[in-house]
Curated annotation (Swiss-Prot):
EC number: 6.3.4.2
Family: Belongs to the CTP synthase family.
UniProt name for this protein: CTP synthase
Binding residues for UTP: 13, 188-193, 224
Coiled-coil parts of chain: none
PROSITE patterns named among the record's database cross-references: GATASE_TYPE_1
Species of provenance: Bacillus cereus (strain AH820)
Binding site for Mg(2+): 71, 141
Organism taxonomic ancestry: Bacteria, Bacillati, Bacillota, Bacilli, Bacillales
Residue sites binding L-glutamine per the record: 54, 354, 382-385, 405, 462
Miscellaneous field: CTPSs have evolved a hybrid strategy for distinguishing between UTP and CTP. The overlapping regions of the product feedback inhibitory and substrate sites recognize a common feature in both compounds, the triphosphate moiety. To differentiate isosteric substrate and product pyrimidine rings, an additional pocket far from the expected kinase/ligase catalytic site, specifically recognizes the cytosine and ribose portions of the product inhibitor.
Keyword Nucleotide-binding: yes
């Protein structure tokens, strides 16, 4: 029978529930269990697709085209699985589904209420995640903090699940904070005690408490927490700030967290073999070289907006025993006069995805700098579109060339709406989303990176390269190295007379893994290292 683990949070948000859940998933997978994982977000948006990155951070896209929480990126990178649309559920999705059922008459005229209709819908999403993947274990992270009004239906639903399927099949893990008061020179357990008290008042008794802390947690403190929170002392797990996220699974294993979980759920599996993971962490901790990459973006104040990009750069660096330092460059501040000052000390330039016109001209200046100075360049989504526009303006001489998204009146719409997007009015969930094939041309940097004729990558865009400009740009040295199999859509572009200048319409960062870097990022970092060594 499928087992269910629920991860909740208390005291404050941003405690690392997602990393804890992902780390536990890695440990259980390495015990030979089929693990899937999901995130419940209590906001009323149907998904984060139309939310500002300042509000929510990165939007992570799954193979099947779901726009989801950035925690799913952590889940995929840690557990090395591809998640789906059932892996991220919001209050908006739940209520939308229930209201549609009510309109269809599925409740037979009954009064639709939070209990049982909303809670039943939540439970069905939990069970469905396990069914769709035939999982041995489903890990569900509940977003928000215990005590929030928004989380109550989710907490009630996961309380009911234990009654529905039995205590041996359900486990609750609660993540809290033990603050350190510098003035007093001591740590305080009271916030954790009150958080657990709040959780128990809702009918949920945690089986494990994971305490986030800056300082070591003494045995006396663990005993105190165990007494007041009514759990075993061994089930108080310390989550210290780590030098690398990838060390967290090893820390949890040292404290036997995965064994406690297996004992409670009556899972008789051998201990997790973490030899390869340990070697990865040792490599990360002992990188001997450095390279610096300029990330020119519009959301650089909130680095979570580009978290998968940064992780993909790091993964690529691991392959070359290199620590990739990201230099954050606000695109709004970049001009032709200061671009040398802002990116001249870097070994490579990356322009990530985005929407809207803010910062666009600064990105184009940075792209021109990379092209003219032979600096390795990687463009992603909007970065690919702007690389095309920069070439049209400054090589072909098409003054005013632009994207119709940025300037609907441009005389040269190098980037235009996809034909199937012309009549779309809704913003949410209507982009070209998910996994699509890309056919590569031989003897190109893109083909050399992948070494395969056809690859599959995840997309999130509404605009596309305008094919009427392809002949002129090809004549000028612009290479269309990747297209859709029918040749209609441009997927990858590069430059003929440049050491490494590649840009993709898709989001390669989404499929990178710490032990298996994404090919374009791998070769981009290699080119950046070569550039540094040649200076």
């Amino acid at each position: 029978m499928t087992k269910y683990i629920f991860v909740t949070g208390g005291v404050v948000s941003s405690l690392g529930k997602g990393i804890t859940a992902a780390s536990l998933g890695r440990l259980l997978k390495n015990r030979g269990l089929n693990v899937t994982i999901q995130k419940f977000d209590p906001y009323i948006n149907v998904d984060p697709g139309t939310m500002s990155p300042y509000q929510h951070g990165e939007v992570f896209v799954t193979d099947d085209g779901a726009e989801t929480d950035l925690d799913l990126g952590h889940y995929e990178r840690f557990i090395d699985i591809n998640l789906n649309k059932y892996s991220n559920v919001t209050t908006g999705k739940i209520y939308s589904s229930v209201l549609q059922k009510e309109r269809r008459g599925e409740y037979l005229g009954g009064t639709v209420q939070v209990i049982p209709h909303i809670t039943n819908e939540i439970k069905e999403r939990v069970y469905r995640s396990g069914r769709e993947t035939n999982a041995d274990v489903v890990i569900t992270e509940i977003g928000g903090t215990v005590g929030d009004i928004e989380s109550l239906p989710f907490l009630e639903a996961i309380r009911q699940i234990k009654s529905d399927i039995g205590r041996d099949n359900v486990m609750y893990i609660h993540c809290t904070l033990i603050p350190y008061l510098k003035a007093a020179g001591e740590m305080k357990t009271k916030p954790t005690q009150h958080s657990v008290k709040e959780l128990r008042s809702l009918g949920i008794q945690p089986n494990i408490i994971v305490v986030r802390t800056e300082m070591p947690v003494s045995q006396d403190m663990k005993d105190k927490l165990a007494l007041f929170c009514d759990i075993d002392t061994k089930a108080v797990i310390e989550a210290r700030d780590a030098d690398t996220l990838y060390a967290v699974p090893l820390s949890l294993q040292e404290q036997n967290m995965d064994q406690i979980v297996c004992d409670h759920l009556k899972l008789d599996n051998p201990a997790a073999d973490m030899t390869e993971w340990t070697a990865l962490v040792e490599k990360v901790r002992n990188l001997s070289k450095k390279t610096k990459i300029a990330l020119v973006g519009k959301y650089v104040e909130l680095q979570d907006a580009y978290i998968s990009v940064v992780e993909a750069l790091r993964h690529a660096g691991y392959s070359f025993d290199t620590d990739v330092e990201v230099k954050w460059v606000n695109a709004e501040h970049v001009t032709a006069e200061n671009v040398q000052e802002l990116v001249g000390d870097t070994d490579g330039i990356l322009v990530p995805g985005g929407f809207g016109d803010r910062g666009v001209e600064g990105k184009i200046v940075a792209i021109q700098y990379a092209r003219e100075n032979k600096v390795p360049f990687l463009g992603i989504c909007l970065g690919m579109q702007l690389a095309s526009i920069e070439f049209a303006r400054n090589v072909l001489g098409l003054e005013g060339a632009n994207s119709s998204e940025i300037n609907p009146d441009t005389p040269y719409a190098i980037i235009d709406l996809l034909p199937e997007q012309k009549d779309v009015e809704d913003l949410g969930g209507t982009l070209r989303l998910g996994l699509y094939p890309c056919k590569l041309s031989e003897e190109t940097n893109a083909y050399n990176a992948y070494n395969e004729p056809v690859v599959y990558e995840r997309h999130r865009h509404r605009y596309e390269f305008n094919n009427q400009f392809r002949p002129d740009m090809e004549k000028a040295g612009f290479v269309f190295s990747g297209t859709s199999p029918d040749g209609r859509l441009v997927e990858i572009i590069e430059l003929k007379d440049h050491p490494w200048f590649v840009a993709a319409q898709f989001h390669p960062e989404l499929v990178s893994r710490p032990n298996r870097p994404q090919p374009l990022f791998h070769d981009f970092v290699r080119a950046s290292i070569t550039n540094k060594e040649s200076k």
